[in-house]
């Protein structure tokens, strides 16, 4: 009897311990077993063009998960068909067929920890495949919702947008504006019974998710496509290593197109073998610009009152300096009597250095900086831009001081060359080039708007005279072979730059380019095209057809009124 009483006493003490002393601890442990945490993903914001067309967006994708300890044969229906006993093997086969998943992978994930409450079966299902999986009615599978990144314009804008990787933003605008685009994840919990089914009304939100902002660009995706196709076709014809094209609105400084070849498709990054294509070369690839820079030197000369379009110079084929350095023009010619206009028209290295020497090295350096050279684009936030830390003085040796006047020994990007021509086209006023308007956050605030303060670089008179001189390049100079654009006066400058090969100096490779504006009497748009290491035509004449095609497309697309008068031409010789 005493033994029975003692045994009852033990049970009573244990019962009190469980129900009173340890009650809160055990309840919490039980709740934790039933309580399932779920991440609520904040949607990453879209990147859109100037018209709202999505360049990058987030779409809903679904992961299918399970609780391995609950995976077992079940009774009922499978996909609407009544089956007495649905085996695990039959269920997984049906799941693989509906989703496109791999049965072996599912089995492996379940077997990895068969007593656990969580394992992935399939990841990244679109809505159609997800609904097919749900229709199967398998009781021990669950959904996990997440956002996936898609790029509707694919390779057309891929070099600009960049892309996302498994560990976040990897390149381009995705990387530069990640802080605004990124959403903030939230969380919630729900309770489920022993059968793994969620208990109705048990969901509790512990942290609200917040969507990312929308990044609005100035890019016109239709024009971007035209530009990309134009340079891709030309680059293949020229057998060029790479190519870029830019289109700029003169009056706003907005870049309407920044195209590259080769391209990257952010929807399938692994297919891109050229890792240099992960960014936009128009912004990241520095090169010696060659003769396009002569337009800036001419503008500086006129602005300082050191020359006029009809100023006279005696121009031999070559010129040797006291320190032993020599320069020459691209093609042999007898000594010529050229005006400043003729020097630009014929792209004479010797001629531009003779007149350019009327400015000090510091003056020329200062003008180049005002035009937007020698520093990263201040209104563009983009990874990989060269630092170009030239300081406040040229620090050039004697030969570079001369060569810089025809674009050798200095570095630029294609967008910086576009900036020079935007300034000249805009009556001498530079507007920092940019292709982002700003990022609108989920609560409606606009952030990351670029600083586009205008700066006068040269007088309106100087800019107009240079524009008029550049028409001679098209009508009778290095672009004379380019088919005219009917009804429009075009002002442009060519560039054929040698490619430095380390300590070996300049070799046989070239970078060819054309930069120009239209209509010349009231420029609205600037177009640049650049080809790196072309093989079938190593002169700027090879770049001319692409420039003409793209400029024609721009003028037609934006319905620019034709020129009302003939081109104003200065004499090129005396």
Model-predicted regions and their roles:
Residues 194-198, 202-203, 249-291, 296-531, ...:
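Beta-lactam-recognizing serine transpeptidase/beta-lactamase-like catalytic domain environment
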Residues 1-25:
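Hydrophobic alpha-helical transmembrane signal-anchor segments
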Residues 35-60:
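Short extracytoplasmic
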Residues 58-70, 257-263:
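Short beta->alpha transition motifs characteristic of CBS
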Residues 65-66, 70, 90-97, 104-212, ...:
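Small/polar-residue-rich segments within soluble enzyme cores
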Residues 446-447, 544-574:
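Short, gly/Ser/Thr-rich active-site loops of penicillin-recognizing serine hydrolases
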Residues 34, 39-43, 239-242, 433:
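Short, small/polar residue-rich loop motifs at catalytic or cofactor-binding pockets
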Residues 199-243:
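Conserved, well-ordered alpha-helix/loop/beta-strand core segments that scaffold catalytic motifs
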